[in-house]
Amino acid sequence: MAEDLLKVEGLKQYYPASSGLFGKKTYVKAVDDVDFEVKKGEVFGIVGESGCGKSTLGKAICKLIEPTDGKIILDGEDIRGYDSKKMRSVRKKVQMVFQDPYASLNPRMSIHDILAEPLVIHGLAKGKQEIDEAVVRLLREVGMDDYHARRYPHEFSGGQRQRIGIARALAERPQLIIA
């Protein structure tokens, strides 16, 4: 039996709402007491209507937002208390493909630079030739051509931008992709 890659226990993400009558604080419960496990090699889906907390759940798992409560256990370690330095090693293992392809890519960077950035930051490719080859490989993995590397995000359709976001997530060869 495959071991757990990710285990989420009692995860909560509450946001303060306006104070009620007599100053009583109220909260919007975006994610409320969620439990699940993802085994290594498993594809796992969370389905729900718009606004039900799927994206918030993904951001909390990646610690892009700090959960209100619960455990996020990745490879047997609870990462909830990790500081930004410890999270760097986690981000090599876990990547997120953001929902909005228009907002998730820096408009001032070429696609080459967007895809090269995680490779350089995490030392996955060194030297211009190795970086260029890795960028081309990533573009091809998502069905795009080499020449797209020289273009900028505004030159692509929403679907193409989404594929660029996927390529960026794949750059670090993560164990878990949240999309």
Q: Predicted regions span which residues?
A:
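The feature captures the beta-strand-to-loop junction immediately N-terminal to the Walker
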Residues: 47-48
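Helix-to-loop junction immediately C-terminal to a conserved catalytic motif
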Residues: 62
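Conserved ABC transporter NBD signature motif
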Residues: 70-78, 90
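Conserved ABC ATPase "signature" region
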Residues: 78, 129-147
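Conserved ABC ATPase signature
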Residues: 152-156, 160
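Hydrophobic anchor residue at the start of the ABC signature
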Residues: 166
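Conserved catalytic motifs of ABC-family nucleotide-binding domains
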Residues: 173
